[in-house]
Amino acid sequence: MPRYAQLVMGPAGSGKSTYCATMVQHCEALNRSVQVVNLDPAAEHFNYSVMADIRELIEVDDVMEDDSLRFGPNGGLVFCMEYFANNFDWLENCLGHVEDDYILFDCPGQIELYTHLPVMKQLVQQLEQWEFRVCGVFLVDSQFMVESFKFISGILAALSAMISLEIPQVNIMTKMDLLSKKAKKEIEKFLDPDMYSLLEDSTSDLRSKKFKKLTKAICGLIDDYSMVRFLPYDQSDEESMNIVLQHIDFAIQYGEDLEFKEPKEREDESSSMFDEYFQECQDE
């Protein structure tokens, strides 16, 4: 039997730990057993029980206090993750060999772990050797994405992780429950975006022709390949959480021995799910 894993990624403050905690609760309500592994050696606290915690192996504070190393916060975290990559046997012992495991890996937020270093790619390869089907779950804060330039930046960060890890990836806008009604209306256009329409919004204030040309090329690339789309994640709405889980389950073919249906909103590129979600928000 295969095992299943979500690699929960995203910038610091995007809600990775909150996502793990709420997704575990949601799965428990569905009578599904889901475990969490903390892979952030700089984590201070989280609202979920863990089956493994990288801080039992190595902590950033201990590395920074080592006078022979003299690392700062970022250097210390990189050292910790490279040490972790050299000690995957520790993780293997923590995970055990239970079939049909479903595990969320709460990852650090530093983008250089996905763009400059091989650590996360090595982790994916190791999990696959242990017969895990791995899906990347990339989170961005919806409050950060309400402007065109910030949205494009978020897409590039998600695309960077996707290209680096070469695994199925579901991209999520978190903290939808914290947005005002006006902000929710603004964010709706970013969930299934017309990149050329966003291009007009984002380049109107640019003075440099070179930057306008670059932005146009980026928007064209994103639109032509349609590789990055975002799903809304509202921890106060069970339907929103269930739709996200369905997409992830489909990506890793969770429960493939059962009759499995592709998430219905994929039948139409301009999905009705977004309309239903925002209509409910407006009716509240």
UniProtKB/Swiss-Prot annotation:
Sites where the protein binds GTP: G13, S14, G15, K16, S17, T18, T174, K175, M176, D177
Pfam families in the cross-refs: ATP_bind_1
Motif (Gly-Pro-Asn (GPN)-loop) on chain: 72-74
A single MF term (Gene Ontology): GTP binding
GO cellular component, one term: protein-containing complex
Job of this protein: Small GTPase required for proper localization of RNA polymerase II (RNAPII). May act at an RNAP assembly step prior to nuclear import.
InterPro entries (alphabetical): Gpn (IPR004130), Gpn3 (IPR030228), P-loop_NTPase (IPR027417)
Family indicated by similarity: Belongs to the GPN-loop GTPase family.
Residues carrying the site annotation Stabilizes the phosphate intermediate: N74
Keywords assigned by UniProt, alphabetized: GTP-binding, Hydrolase, Nucleotide-binding
Domain of life per record: Eukaryota
Name by which UniProt lists this protein: GPN-loop GTPase 3
Species this protein is from: Homo sapiens (Human)
Keyword Acyltransferase: no
Complex and partners: Heterodimer with GPN1. Binds to RNA polymerase II (RNAPII). Interacts directly with subunits RPB4 and RPB7 and the CTD of RPB1.
